[in-house]
Amino acid sequence: MLINTKKCVGCYACRMACQMINKLEPEEAFISYKEIEQGTYPSVYAETVPVQCMHCENAPCQQVCPTHATYTTDSGVVLVDEEKCIGCKYCMAACPYGVRIQIEKTGVIEKCRFCWYEGEPGNPPACVGTCISGARVFGDLDDPESDISREIARTNAQPIAGDLTESKIYYVR
């Protein structure tokens, strides 16, 4: 996924769509926002940076899970097996992005799953489809001809923390 913070208007529609499709409570969210001051006086502005699971290639959350509830699919999506999760929160502590939450009703630790359900990749995630400014692009990072690969090359998008965890979410900032 690519998130272009220059296009993001901070409307939170992506977060609301995510909450609805995942049946999350209002206080539960897989997407959070950082407001970062940019520029110098008198040309100061706030950059809205949506933050969610980065679906890391080298996922610290997966490495610490004692029950192996956190796993990576063949296509690189990091998921949580709700049947195996014991709610110990080790993965929450290990995540360098602070994007995992505990679902109050079940005690399971969850996070963005790119709207992947029942083991099958579906349409683009709800956050992409609902973005009014076109700030999000989703696709196959391994296909150099995909829209996302072309957009990453065109904009020089980078993972938010460099290659610390080999994130699969790229940002234009």
Residue ranges of model-derived segments:
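Non-ligating segments of multi-cofactor redox enzymes
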Residues: 1-173
